[in-house]
Each structure stands twice: as C-alpha cells, then as structure tokens.
C-alpha cells in the first residue's frame, strides 16, 4: 500500500495555471500533487558569445527552491555563494530536455531561459519543472509567432518527465517525498510524445533490479507522461 493510498500506476493530481506572472513571455504554476513549481520563459534578443553569428538560437534552464519549500528551511544558495551540485545537475537537465524538442535554427538568434522555481516540494520537483517549462516555452514561442518575429514553429513536439520507483517491492508511478525517501530504487524519465526517450536516470538505492524491472518502470513512465501530454495540450490550446 502506498502512503497516499494511490494505485501503483496512479499519478498525483496535475494542476496547471498559465499566465501566472505578467512580465514573462510565458509562465505557469504547475502542480504534481503537493509539489508546486513556478515556470517562466524569458525571451532575450541576445545570445551567449560562443553562439553569435551562427544563425541559431538557444534554450537554457535555471532551477531553484524557495528556502521553505521543504519541511525545514534551507539557506538560499545565493547566501552560500555557490550553487549545489544538485541544482547544477537539474538545471542542465531542464535545458537539455527542452532543446530536444526545439529546432534552434528556426528559433532565430535569440535565447529563451526557462526559470523553474520550486515553491513547495513533495517529490518530483525536477520532473514537474521540465513538464511545466515546456508549457512556458510553448506560450512564449506562440507569442513570438503571433507577433511575426518567428515564421516557422521551432517547437518540434511535446516533452514531459515523470518519476517512478520500486516501493515496498512494487513498481510505482510519480513518487511523493514519503515514497522517494524510502524507495528501493527510483528513476526519472524524460519522454517525447510519440515514444522517444530524451533522458533516463535510474538508481538502485536499497536494492538492485533487473532489466524487466527497468522496463516496468519505463512502462509506468509512459502511462504518466501520456497524462501530462494531455494536460499540456489543455493548458496551451
């Protein structure tokens, strides 16, 4: 039995509120259960020096957590003077994931930064960030197209992410904090609509598992991402 009482293949409720901030070109507040992440897309008509003059744009991501997003207050990374390795890993993951579904040449010589700020954490913050960042990106790019700044849509498809794990010997979908902190194994999958895998991270925590165990987690991820794709459609139509 899962602590939440959910079935093994049952996700937490997905909530999405678009246009959450008025200044960003695209924004949403996404929730996977009690995990809440504010995702904003900022369009800048400039590029990193190493990309200038190459006829393409860039999509990158940043990630942070509010000090009291978790059970106990954590110090702001700015106060510590450096980002943690976890933060750097997650924001690189966000950038890689979004670039997997963007034609950078069609984007033109501009940069879009996806800022993912965790307001409340209850497991799955990186997966909610990626899923919400795509919505913010979609809204920002649609705005550029409506303004005539981009002719052809540079977004090639939808991308979403979800966590899975083995909890009390059972493969389960969309781990919350109680499950994640006690899971025998956990995995994060980033999937493109249509079946392609953009990223897979799998770790044995308390026990190892075989190939079939990994495939069972992947099948759960496919179930979860199908639900996220539907929610993304509804949020951006």
UniProtKB/Swiss-Prot annotation:
The keyword rRNA processing applies. It is an enzyme of class 2 (transferase). GO terms for biological process: rRNA catabolic process; rRNA processing; tRNA processing. Keywords: Nucleotidyltransferase, RNA-binding, rRNA processing, Transferase, tRNA processing, tRNA-binding. GO terms for molecular function: 3'-5'-RNA exonuclease activity; tRNA binding; tRNA nucleotidyltransferase activity. It catalyses: tRNA(n+1) + phosphate = tRNA(n) + a ribonucleoside 5'-diphosphate. The keyword Mitochondrion does not apply. It comes from the Bacteria. Its EC number is 2.7.7.56. Phosphate binds at residues 86, 124-126. It holds the Pfam family RNase_PH. Phosphorolytic 3'-5' exoribonuclease that plays an important role in tRNA 3'-end maturation. Removes nucleotide residues following the 3'-CCA terminus of tRNAs; can also add nucleotides to the ends of RNA molecules by using nucleoside diphosphates as substrates, but this may not be physiologically important. Probably plays a role in initiation of 16S rRNA degradation (leading to ribosome degradation) during starvation. Homohexameric ring arranged as a trimer of dimers. Belongs to the RNase PH family. PANTHER family: EXOSOME COMPLEX COMPONENT (PTHR11953), EXOSOME COMPLEX COMPONENT RRP41 (PTHR11953:SF0). This is Ribonuclease PH. It comes from Erythrobacter litoralis (strain HTCC2594). The lineage of its organism: Bacteria, Pseudomonadati, Pseudomonadota, Alphaproteobacteria, Sphingomonadales.
